Regions:
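Structured, amphipathic secondary-structure segments that form assembly/contact surfaces
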Residues: 75-188
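Juxtamembrane and targeting peptides
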Residues: 2-72
Length: 188
């Protein structure tokens, strides 16, 4: 029985050696190098289509400016401008705030209607706040702006100023994921 076990072990060793590769050691190239693919910015349509989504400063400026780019002549409600900025917002944030924008601006519907009736147009001026804030990381950034909206109609002109605090996250591309908008201050 011992001789049979030894013979079987010897036969197995010879068989395994015969199945080996004839190439000398060190010639196996291993796995092929992976194909390098580059990420392309997600396509954004509308007024923010040219925004560089890798630049948090550009995203922050363009999103905040668009949120306040009200168009009483063309838009149904004051919230339409913010909805146009949704492509550069975090999906959950955009969804959760879709019905809240008019309330965030604190402009009554009656005021919006008066701007519509006055054929008003708006212009927006942003000034970045340079107050101390947490440093940007690869994944998040914060920005603060003073936003002045000038509403000019056929019969009246009005200026509103807001303080805006915005938080952005980076999950491949910068997106607005939180915003705080102050009470409007009427400017003379």
């Amino acid at each position: 029985m011992k001789k049979t076990a030894i013979a079987l072990a010897l036969a197995s060793a010879v068989a395994l050696t015969a199945c080996g590769n004839d190439e000398p050691d060190g010639t196996d190239t291993g796995m092929e190098d992976p194909t390098v693919s580059q990420w392309e910015q997600p396509e954004v349509r509308g007024p923010l289509q040219d925004t560089d989504q890798e630049d948090v400063d550009k995203v922050a400026h363009d999103v905040v400016e668009q949120i306040f780019s009200w168009s009483p002549k063309d838009d149904h409600t004051i919230a339409d401008a913010a909805r146009k900025a949704e492509p550069l917002m975090d999906e959950d944030f955009a969804y959760n705030n879709r019905d809240s924008w008019a309330g965030m601006f604190k402009v009554p519907g009656k005021q919006w209607a008066s701007w519509v009736n006055d054929n008003a147009t708006t212009s927006v001026e942003l000034t970045e706040g340079l107050e101390e804030r947490p440093e940007d990381t690869d994944m998040e950034a914060r920005r603060q702006y003073s936003v002045e909206v000038t509403i000019k109609g056929d019969k009246q002109e009005q200026k509103l100023r807001y303080d805006v605090f915005a938080h952005f996250n980076n999950l491949g591309w910068w997106r607005l994921d939180n915003i705080t908008i102050s009470q409007p201050q009427t400017m003379s």
